[in-house]
Amino acid sequence: MAFNNKKKNANYISAKESRAIARENRKITQEIEKKRNRKHIPEEEYVTKMKNPENCVEFDNVQTYFFTDIGTVKSVDGVSFDVPQGKTVGIVGESGCGKSVTSLSLMQLVQRPSGQTVGGEIRFNTGDHVYNVVNTPTSVMQKLRGNYMSMIFQEPM
């Protein structure tokens, strides 16, 4: 029986390729985490203005990716929509299309360090301030969660 080494499965990556991808993705996530976990971040970096003051939340070209050992999964890639004050908005779509990741991005609860919101803006209006959640430090988000925003996830228990 002859074994042909020249045929390569399109869905297969070598251990060497996997290590290179993992190394690059670790570098990317470490850089993002380093920026996020800085001390004394000036408010100018995360306090912003709403495009429409009638909204309580604005998703603008949001990109949330998962950096794995075998590549990058673009779970949410370019999502934009508004949530007007006093209104209920439903997000509907097929399983795996990014509904939960979108809501986790708003709460800054995406599983880090592999999951990161890498682009766009999520503007959240507390009434006193407008925060770009993508750039808001973890310490500030912890104060916002529960006091100004909360979420009931599809599987609470």
Predicted regions and their residues:
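ABC transporter nucleotide-binding domains
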Residues: 1-157
